[in-house]
Amino acid sequence: MSWQTILAIGSGGFIGAVLRAYFNGIISHKMPHDIPFGTLGVNLVGSFIMGILIAYFMYSTIFSLHVKSFLSTGVLGALTTYSTFAIESFLLLNSGHIALALANISLNAFGSILMAGGGFYIIKLSLRA
C-alpha cells in the first residue's frame, strides 16, 4: 500500500469519525433513547452511500484508487463499519451465494454481540479482582 493511499484512508477516516460523532449526537438528542437511533441512522445512511459508491466504482472509471480509498475505506469506514458489512453481504447475495451471505450476516451480527459482551465481562471481572 502506497503512502498516498494510507494518507487518503487516514484523512477520510478523520472526516468519517467526526461526521459519525456529529450526526450520532444530533440524532440521539432528538430521538427517544429506547433504541440507539443515532447509531442506526449513521449505519443506514452509510450503507446506502456505500452502495452508491460501489456501483460507481464498479461501473465507472472516473474515480482514482486514492479517491476510492478516501471515500469507502476512509470516510465510510470510520462513519460506519456496518456499511462494509452491508455491501459485502449484498455482493454475496447478488452473486447467488445465499448460504454464504446468510452465514456472513449471522456470524457478524451474533458474533459481534458475543465478542462485545465477552470483552465487557472480561474487563468487568478483572476490575473486581
Swiss-Prot record:
Catalytic activity, reaction form: fluoride(in) = fluoride(out)
GO MF term (any one): metal ion binding
Regulation: Na(+) is not transported, but it plays an essential structural role and its presence is essential for fluoride channel function.
Domain of life: Bacteria
Record's keyword terms, sorted: Cell inner membrane, Cell membrane, Ion channel, Ion transport, Membrane, Metal-binding, Sodium, Transmembrane, Transmembrane helix, Transport
Annotated Pfam families: CRCB (PF02537)
GO biological process, one term: cellular detoxification of fluoride
CC per GO annotation: plasma membrane
Keyword hit for Zinc: no
Record has Zinc-finger as a keyword: no
Binding residues for Na(+): G77, T80
Membrane-crossing residue ranges in chain numbering: 6-26, 35-55, 73-93, 98-118
Localization of this protein: Cell inner membrane
Disulphide bridges, residue numbers: none
Membrane-related topology note: Multi-pass membrane protein
Role noted for this protein: Fluoride-specific ion channel. Important for reducing fluoride concentration in the cell, thus reducing its toxicity.
Family: Belongs to the fluoride channel Fluc/FEX (TC 1.A.43) family.
Protein name: Fluoride-specific ion channel FluC
Protein's organism: Sulfurimonas denitrificans (strain ATCC 33889 / DSM 1251)
